[in-house]
Each structure stands twice: as C-alpha cells, then as structure tokens.
Amino acid sequence: APTVALLLLCALCSAADAPPPPPSAAASADGAYHAGVRPAPTPRDRVEVRVGLSLAQLVSLDEKNEELTTKVYLDLSWWDPRLQWDPHDYGGLGGLRVAASRLWLPDIGLDNNNDGEF
C-alpha cells in the first residue's frame, strides 16, 4: 500500500508541473474556434490563400480526345490568427497537427476538369 501511495503522489506531482494542454483547433468549451468561419478580422476582409501545384505523375495522354490525366499534389497555405499561441506558454510547443476536417478550409475547385472530380 505505501508503494501505491508513493506512485500516486509522484504522478500527481508530475501532472501539477506539466504545462497547460496545447492549444487545439477543435472548438473549445466556449466555442472559440468555428471551422465554418473564415479567418478574417471582418467579413469584408480577404483571406490570402497561396496555392501550389506539383506534378506527381503523368498518368496518360489521349491526343484524340484531348485528355491529359495526371496526379498532382496541391499545397494550400493561409494565416489563421485564431490558431496562434505563445510557445513559451506551452512548454516550447511551436506547432501541432490537426485533422483538416476540424479547420476552416478554402473553397478551391478546378474549372476545366473533365470528370468533375477534384
């Protein structure tokens, strides 16, 4: 029993010294982050989205039907001030990975697309 109490005490002391939990892109209890809201100070402000496209593979070229099939990597980047924090407040944590489904994402599409999928 004394060993269990000592281990429990050590665990509690470690938890007390731990930094606060890292910031999260998930909505907090007070609803501070909403993935459906554009990260702009006002509704009239623009969100600058930088777009990069890298060719990964040339799959096929059908000259008769004028179809080119490729595989590409799409790189989108923008600044969302709602997801910033001071790393010193979180034990030096400078970044974290969050599922894209939990973040605001720009509405990007390909206009000249043969099969309608992008």
Swiss-Prot record:
Membrane topology label: Multi-pass membrane protein
Localization: Postsynaptic cell membrane; Cell membrane
Record bears the keyword Transmembrane: yes
Broad class of where this protein is predominantly found: membrane
A Gene Ontology cellular-component term: postsynaptic membrane
GO molecular function: acetylcholine-gated monoatomic cation-selective channel activity; transmembrane signaling receptor activity
Function: After binding acetylcholine, the AChR responds by an extensive change in conformation that affects all subunits and leads to opening of an ion-conducting channel across the plasma membrane.
Signal peptide: 1-15
Binding partners and assembly: Pentamer of two alpha chains, and one each of the beta, delta, and gamma chains.
Catalysed reaction, written as an equation: K(+)(in) = K(+)(out); Na(+)(in) = Na(+)(out)
Protein's recorded name: Acetylcholine receptor subunit beta
Similarity-based family: Belongs to the ligand-gated ion channel (TC 1.A.9) family. Acetylcholine receptor (TC 1.A.9.1) subfamily. Beta-1/CHRNB1 sub-subfamily.
Tagged with keyword Nucleus: no
Classification via InterPro entries: Neur_chan_lig-bd (IPR006202), Neur_chan_lig-bd_sf (IPR036734), Neur_channel (IPR006201), Nicotinic_acetylcholine_rcpt (IPR002394)
Parts of the chain that traverse the membrane: none
Keyword line: Cell membrane, Ion channel, Ion transport, Ligand-gated ion channel, Membrane, Postsynaptic cell membrane, Receptor, Signal, Synapse, Transmembrane, Transport
